[in-house]
A protein has these predicted regions:
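Short beta-strand/loop motif that positions the catalytic acidic residue
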Residues: 75, 80-83, 87
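Short beta-strand immediately N-terminal to the catalytic nucleophile in serine-hydrolase-like folds
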Residues: 33-35, 63
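A conserved short beta-strand
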Residues: 53-67
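Post-His helix in hydrolase/transferase enzymes
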Residues: 117-132
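Acidic catalytic loop of the alpha/beta-hydrolase fold
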Residues: 85-90, 114-115
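Short alpha-helix in the alpha/beta-hydrolase fold that links the catalytic acid
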Residues: 91-99
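Gly/Ala-rich beta-loop-alpha elbow adjacent to hydrolase catalytic centers
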Residues: 35-43
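Serine-hydrolase catalytic machinery in alpha/beta-hydrolase-like enzymes
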Residues: 1-30
Length: 142
């Protein structure tokens, strides 16, 4: 998933843009990438290629990273890595083992499974806090 972010951003009027205006608009906005599960694997390699071309995205978010299923590439130190405590598809220990040599912080959502049922608000809150430079709680039960 690729998105462009602008703070604050309004979708009002986007439908009115013609095809020629859109590329110019997105060139002016910072690039953010996010991947969930297999998408985190894909995102890691897209970021690697973009970085080699000096076009690295400003932000990378990896949720439920599929580190035990695929060889996920190393990522920038400021990557937001979020994983569920009770993920039965990708064990938390696999993500921690992948993150440890990179000295990445892994945000663990207590009680969350691989699909973060009833925990999506926690993902949102972690990302919003990180993007606004606010500290993230070590353990938050919602």
């Amino acid at each position: 998933v690729i998105a462009w972010m602008k703070d604050p951003f309004s979708w009002q009027g986007i439908k009115e843009l013609d095809g020629h205006a859109w590329p110019q608009l997105v060139e002016e906005l910072p690039l953010a990438m996010a991947g969930f599960s297999f998408g985190s694997y894909v995102s890691s390699y897209v970021v690697k290629e973009l970085t080699e071309k000096n076009e690295a995205p400003e932000r990378l978010i990896m949720v439920g990273s599929a580190t035990s299923k695929w060889d996920v590439a190393p990522v920038p130190k400021d990557t937001i890595v979020i994983h569920g405590e009770v993920d039965d598809v990708i064990p938390l220990t696999s993500v921690l083992d992948w993150a440890r040599p990179q000295e990445l912080t892994v945000q663990v959502i207590p009680g969350a499974d691989h699909f973060f049922h009833r925990k999506l608000h926690c993902i949102r809150d972690l990302i919003v806090r990180a993007w606004h430079g606010q500290p993230t709680p070590v353990n938050e039960n919602k």
